[in-house]
Structure formats: C-alpha cells, structure tokens
C-alpha cells in the first residue's frame, strides 16, 4: 500500500513510529505537511499539490493534524476523501472531536458518563453556573486549550467567579466542570483502535499539580481497565466517529467519566508505559479497513 502521514513534524515520535511500522510491513510511506499542500477542486479531476508537484494517489492517509491547524489540515484531509482515499480518521470526525463543548453534548446524548459541565455567555449567569456543577472546587477549561493549557482549578467560589469573569472579559470560550476529588490527580488514557481498546495507561499529576498531562510533568504507568471502562472508551470514540482515539477517563465514585476524546493521540507515552507496538497495530488496522466502505461516519466530508 501507499500510505501518507499528514504531519507537520516528521521528526516527532508518533510520526516516526508510524513511518517505521508501515515500512516494516512492506508499505510505501510519505510524510506530508498539510500546510504545504494546495488544492485543485473541480468536478472532473480534483488534486492536491506541493511546490508544483501533483501528489500521487494514496491508498490511505493517517492524519496527525495539530490543533493549531485544524481548519486547514482538515480541508486537506477532506480533499483526500473527495478523491476517494481512505482516511484513518475522517475530517468531519476530527473537526467534531476538536470542539470540546460539542463533544460533551454528543456524549451526553448517548448516555456516556461525564463530569457535570456548565456553559454560559453572560457574567450574570456565573453564580448559577457554579451552583450547577456543585460549587467550588471546580475546573474551568478554555475550549481551545490542549495538553492541559488553559485548564484552571478554582478552589474557592470567589476564585471561580474571578477566573470565569476574567475569561469572559477576554471573550474566551470556556466551560466549567465539577472537580472529581476522588480521582486524586490521575486519569486514564485509553487508546481506542476500531472497536476495542488496544492499550491503556494511568497518568498521575506531578506533586502540587492537578493536571495529569505528560506535557505538564505527569508520569505514566500501565493500568488494568475494567470492562465498563473499556466499553465507555469505545463508545466515546464511536460517538465522535473516530477509528483511532485517545479517550481520557476519570475514575469516580459513580463510574468512569470521559474528560476528552483526542483524535491525534500521541504514541510515545502509551508505547513507553505499556510496551505495546501501537503503531504496528494502527498499520494492521489500515490494511484491513482501507478497502471497506462505507466508512464509520457514513458520509465523506
């Protein structure tokens, strides 16, 4: 097969591992920076170009699109879809999962466990918003934040009001969530591939920190999932329409709660913590799925 990896960073661990795994299984693979692509959109022969070169037809595309380039990256991914190329995660699913509020709304409709979440526009609604999520302490999240950036733990009601007012004053979109104290600064990253969890790790926040992201100094260890946790992770990924997803769970007193569904989950932490060849599993999945239609979201684009 001829496989393209859409990535801005050929030197990044996840990109390198996908390239290695594809080559080990006998495939031709090329890393393509989506920002270097431009598109010819027409009814007869749509195409994608880089620096005057028309790209060849690929059998499959693996999107590794950073959040900062979601719009353009997904436009390029969608162009591949229009050309009939199999994409591991479809553009519509990537776009959907990048909208944190929409993700929460979709999962709540499916009955998937979530922290109580509030969203408002007017400062006058702040007191009621805080009450809705159970009062302080509570978590305030920028909808555009990634890797723990833009996530604040407000330990008192006064602090919560001040932070929410400040974000609203900056016209930043935020959501407010209940703080799951019993999680003790830990979450579980479930790596979902197709209809099963192929690897999972527990991420523990660094001392004095409540965010467990590895980019924030958290540590990762192997974890054994319960059947319910596996089921919730797979259902969350399917709700987003993702074939590959990193689903972050919190263990609460009333069962697993989904914090986030990531459409471009990193491989370094999960492979390091579990010792599993996740990159190889992804390529094996593509080998089986690339020729199947219709795709998971049921529509191209």
Curated annotation (Swiss-Prot):
Mn(2+) 1 binds at residues 248, 260. ATP binds at residues 141, 178-179, 187, 211-213. Binds 2 magnesium or manganese ions per subunit. Its EC number is 6.3.2.-. GO terms for molecular function: ATP binding; metal ion binding; ribosomal S6-glutamic acid ligase activity. It is an enzyme of class 6 (ligase). Mg(2+) 2 binds at residues 260, 262. This is Probable alpha-L-glutamate ligase 1. The gene is rimK1.
């Amino acid at each position: 097969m001829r496989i393209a990896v859409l990535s801005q960073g050929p030197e990044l661990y996840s990109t390198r591992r996908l390239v290695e795994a594809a080559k080990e299984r006998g495939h031709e693979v090329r890393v393509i920076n989506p920002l270097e692509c431009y598109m010819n959109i027409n009814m007869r022969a749509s195409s994608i170009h880089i620096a005057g070169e028309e790209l060849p037809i690929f059998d499959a595309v693996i999107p590794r699109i950073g959040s900062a380039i979601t719009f353009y990256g997904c436009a390029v991914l969608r162009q591949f879809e229009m050309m009939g190329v199999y994409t591991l995660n479809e553009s519509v699913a990537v776009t959907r999962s990048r909208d944190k509020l929409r993700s929460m709304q979709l999962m709540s409709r499916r009955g998937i466990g979530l922290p109580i979440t509030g969203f408002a526009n007017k400062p006058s609604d702040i007191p009621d918003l805080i009450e809705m999520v159970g009062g302080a302490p509570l978590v305030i999240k920028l909808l555009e934040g990634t890797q723990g950036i833009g996530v604040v733990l407000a330990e008192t009601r006064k602090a919560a009001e001040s932070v929410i007012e400040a974000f609203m004053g900056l016209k930043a979109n935020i959501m407010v969530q209940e703080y799951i104290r019993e999680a003790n600064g830990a979450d579980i990253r479930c790596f979902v591939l197709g209809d099963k969890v192929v690897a999972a790790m527990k991420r523990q926040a660094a001392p004095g920190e409540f965010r467990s992201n590895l980019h924030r100094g958290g540590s990762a260890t192997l974890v054994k999932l319960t059947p319910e946790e596996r089921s919730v992770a797979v259902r969350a990924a399917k709700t987003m329409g993702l074939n590959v997803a990193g689903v972050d769970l919190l263990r609460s007193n009333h069962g697993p709660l989904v914090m986030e569904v990531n459409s471009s989950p990193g491989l370094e932490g999960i492979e390091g913590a579990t010792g599993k060849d996740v990159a190889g599993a992804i390529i094996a999945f593509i080998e089986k799925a690339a020729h199947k239609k219709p795709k998971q979201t049921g529509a191209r684009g």
